[in-house]
């Protein structure tokens, strides 16, 4: 045992060690040290500010440079900068070649054709179903239904099951403010027409993530369905659906959970068997093929076998291969869900393209995908911070505004009154159950403001996809996108079919949306930031001249 002065020195060293980090700074304050007491464990973290240029291993950049070579779109459009992959992704050569090959050599309709060409087309069509099951690692008895996209899929799911589930006025359907209109309007239409059921909205926390604890406390025995997106198509937040599903099912196992995976499927590898083992598997999962590098007009629905055995689903359309017997006044239908919901002639080459796309995805290193997309995401913030700062001298009333920590909001509020009303409590709740913290509140200034809505929650283990919405109260989002188009840059403006998110969470009418994918490059990110900064400056000057 140590005694005397030596023991005292060691004791003082460990007592004051955490506080010593508080005074460590380099000359330009580029590092922020987050320090916690050493008594709580070695939890000292180093975080780079937005002034610090992000880094990634060069071999990962080279890896995705090689992946990009598989996309002929970029060879044919060398001067075009494409940042609209949340709307649709480009197609690798193997997908384009397969669709062309079908029309050249294999063109035939499926099912009921006895001749060899039709038989082969049917087999190849059904193989895609097996490819999807293998890719998402689901069971053989689980259902995969082909659709023409997520909008159709969400409508099909609502209409085929709502009469079975929503039978009383007090029955509840939970949605979120982040939902695409196709996951809101079908539920609204049924409720307004039939006068049964009611819609409630899940509470969001300060960062745009679902407040799970509050959600569970709001639910009850009358809650029948929760239908939410895995990733927002506007702010890019990836919800922790496994945690959400597990907690809901533990308390209310009867609730049907529907996940819209339109934005997430191209960025996240799903493992249904693992989710089932952890009791965190959705009952239904819906996605679009064209958003994971397959053809336009394609998609699929996953329906858990446990759900399909419990309910009798209705077809949305009648005719074609869903009929087993037709009499003068009554008809009988098939029981197979895939046959029941795939009425009429399908987009056969498009469905085949989904299989080829997933075979292409199997070769992608998914450990690299998230790292690379977040590197590009951070690189954009870095360059925007750099180039917009250059404009501060010329245009002092233009602010680059983040949802950022370590800001003295109390003094800021005295000179920049916010649009939002705060109460005296630590958190506030508006009329729409959206909670936000004072310390991370986005500031809507009375002065000219340019905002990038980004709240970096990765240090808390909450993930994002590479989507960044921009907004200015000085100029229109549509003007920004139009002028960027003159510079061969493709980004999207509007409410992106998510008007509730804009109205109740972002509190703006529309945004300009940048969506990043693994075929984008650091050079494109730099050019994008340069042009947004210069275009914003120009649009401000145009306004000031009026």
Swiss-Prot record:
GO molecular function: cysteine desulfurase activity
Span of the signal peptide: 1-22
Active-site annotation: 497 (cysteine persulfide intermediate)
Swiss-Prot/TrEMBL cofactor(s): pyridoxal 5'-phosphate
Record PTM text: Proteolytically cleaved.
Entry EC no(s): 2.8.1.7
Main location: plastid
Reaction(s) catalysed (UniProt annotation): (sulfur carrier)-H + L-cysteine = (sulfur carrier)-SH + L-alanine
One Pfam family matching this protein: Aminotran_5
Residue positions, PTM N6-(pyridoxal phosphate)lysine: 291
Highest taxon, organism lineage: Eukaryota
Pathway membership: Cofactor biosynthesis; iron-sulfur cluster biosynthesis
InterPro entries cross-referenced by the UniProt entry: Aminotrans_V_dom (IPR000192), PyrdxlP-dep_Trfase (IPR015424), PyrdxlP-dep_Trfase_major (IPR015421), PyrdxlP-dep_Trfase_small (IPR015422)
Phenotype caused by lack of the gene: Parasites require exogenously provided mevalonate for survival. Apicoplast structure is disrupted.
EC top class named in words: transferase
One annotated GO biological process: cysteine metabolic process
Protein location: Plastid, Apicoplast
GO cellular component: apicoplast
SUPFAM superfamilies: PLP-dependent transferases
Alphabetized UniProt keyword annotations: Apicoplast, Plastid, Pyridoxal phosphate, Signal, Transferase
UniProt keyword Signal present: yes
Assembly, per entry: Monomer. Interacts with SufE; interaction enhances cysteine desulfurase activity of SufS.
Family the entry assigns: Belongs to the class-V pyridoxal-phosphate-dependent aminotransferase family. Csd subfamily.
Function: Catalyzes sulfur activation and mobilization in sulfur mobilization (SUF) pathway for iron-sulfur (Fe-S) cluster biogenesis. Active when in complex with a partner protein SufE. Required for apicoplast maintenance. Plays a role in the development of sporozoites in oocysts in mosquitoes. May provide sulfur for MNMA-mediated tRNA modifications.
Note: Dose-dependent inhibition of catalytic activity by d-cycloserine (DCS) was observed in the presence of SufE. Compounds related to DCS may therefore show antimalarial activity.
Protein name stated in the entry: Cysteine desulfurase SufS
Species annotation: Plasmodium falciparum (isolate 3D7)
Gene responsible for this protein: SufS
């Amino acid at each position: 045992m140590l005694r005397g002065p030596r023991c005292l020195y060691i004791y003082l060293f460990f007592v004051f060690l955490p506080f010593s980090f508080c005074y460590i700074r380099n000359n330009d304050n580029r590092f922020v040290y987050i320090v916690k007491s050493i008594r709580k464990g070695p939890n000292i973290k180093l975080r780079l500010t937005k002034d610090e240029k992000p880094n990634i291993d060069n071999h990962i950049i080279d890896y995705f440079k090689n992946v990009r070579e598989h996309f002929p779109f970029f060879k044919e459009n060398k001067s075009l900068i494409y940042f609209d992959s949340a709307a649709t992704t480009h197609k690798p050569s193997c997908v384009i070649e397969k669709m062309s090959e079908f029309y050249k050599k294999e063109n035939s309709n499926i099912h009921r054709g006895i001749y060899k060409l039709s038989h082969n087309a049917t087999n190849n069509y059904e193989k895609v179903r097996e490819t999807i099951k293998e890719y998402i690692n689901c069971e053989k008895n689980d259902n995969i239904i082909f659709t023409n996209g997520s909008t159709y899929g969400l409508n099909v799911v609502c209409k085929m099951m709502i009469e079975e589930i929503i039978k009383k006025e007090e029955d509840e359907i939970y949605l979120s403010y982040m939902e695409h209109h196709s996951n809101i309007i079908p539920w609204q239409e049924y409720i307004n027409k039939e006068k049964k059921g009611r819609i409630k909205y899940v509470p969001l926390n300060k960062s745009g993530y679902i407040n799970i604890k509050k959600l569970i406390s709001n639910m009850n025995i009358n809650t029948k369905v929760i239908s939410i997106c895995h990733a927002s198509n506007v702010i890019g937040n990836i919800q922790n659906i496994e945690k959400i599903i597990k907690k809901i099912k533990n308390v209310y196992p009867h609730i049907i959970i529907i996940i819209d995976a339109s934005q997430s499927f191209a960025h996240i590898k799903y493992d249904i068997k693992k989710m089932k083992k952890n009791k965190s598997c959705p009952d239904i999962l819906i996605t679009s093929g064209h958003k994971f590098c397959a053809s336009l007009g394609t998609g699929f629905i996953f329906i858990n076998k446990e759900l399909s055995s419990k309910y009798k689903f209705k077809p949305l359309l009648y005719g074609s291969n869903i009929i087993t017997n037709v009499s003068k006044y009554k008809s009988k239908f098939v029981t197979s869900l895939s046959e029941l919901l795939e009425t009429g002639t399908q987009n056969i080459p498009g469905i085949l393209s989904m299989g080829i796309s997933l075979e292409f995805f199997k070769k992608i290193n998914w450990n690299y995908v998230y790292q690379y997309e977040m590197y590009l995401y951070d690189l954009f913030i870095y360059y925007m911070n750099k180039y917009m700062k250059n404009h501060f001298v010329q245009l002092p009333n233009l602010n680059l505004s983040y949802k950022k920590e370590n800001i003295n909001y109390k003094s800021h509020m005295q000179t920049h009154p916010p649009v939002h009303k705060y109460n005296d409590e630590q958190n506030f709740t508006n009329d729409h159950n959206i909670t936000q913290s004072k310390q991370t509140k986005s500031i809507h200034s009375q002065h000219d403001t340019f905002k990038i809505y980004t709240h970096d929650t990765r240090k808390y283990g909450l993930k994002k996809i590479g989507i960044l919405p921009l907004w200015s109260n000085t100029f229109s989002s549509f003007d920004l996108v139009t002028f960027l188009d003159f510079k061969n840059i493709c980004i999207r403006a509007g409410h992106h079919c998510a008007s509730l998110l804009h109205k109740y969470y972002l509190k703006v009418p529309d945004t300009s949306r940048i969506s990043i994918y693994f075929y984008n490059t650091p050079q494109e990110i730099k050019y994008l930031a340069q042009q947004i900064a210069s275009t914003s400056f120009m649009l401000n000057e145009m306004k000031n001249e009026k």
